UniProtKB/Swiss-Prot annotation:
<keyword id="KW-0496">Mitochondrion</keyword>
<comment type="function">
    <text>Stress-responsive protein that may play a role in regulation of cell cycle.</text>
</comment>
<protein>
    <recommendedName>
        <fullName>Stress-responsive protein 1</fullName>
    </recommendedName>
</protein>
<dbReference type="GO" id="GO:0034599">
    <property type="term" value="P:cellular response to oxidative stress"/>
</dbReference>
<keyword id="KW-0346">Stress response</keyword>
<dbReference type="GO" id="GO:0005739">
    <property type="term" value="C:mitochondrion"/>
</dbReference>
Length: 106
């Protein structure tokens, strides 16, 4: 799934998220894709949250990933509500598809 990301843009953020998760016994993540009804824009999103304190550790979506211009960004750049981009007014009418919520217990 992550092979489609630009290498070096998000890799350090993903490593940071992994280290955040190493101390948690449970965490959840969700994935989703959406497209505008008129077919002019498509996108995806991924987020992971610590179940214990309900905080979102990392949120990645196609808009923020593409706007980096191949520059590495701090983890805080990606910490956002997962649907901020997919549901933004800029998208207009949209169709959501393939939204999944997952939970992992160690």
């Amino acid at each position: 799934m992550f092979s489609i990301l630009k290498q070096g843009v998000i890799s350090k953020s993903l490593l940071a998220a992994t280290s955040l998760k190493a101390t948690a016994s449970r965490f959840s993540f969700s994935t989703s894709v959406a497209s505008r009804v008129d077919g002019t824009k498509n996108g995806w999103s991924f987020t992971a949250s610590n179940v214990a304190d309900q905080t979102t550790d990392i949120g990645i979506n196609s808009e923020s990933a593409m706007s980096c211009n191949d520059q590495e960004q701090p983890l805080s750049f990606y910490v956002q509500t997962v649907r901020d981009d997919l549901n933004s007014p800029n998208w207009g009418a949209e169709q959501r598809k393939g939204a999944f919520d997952w939970e992992v217990s160690a």
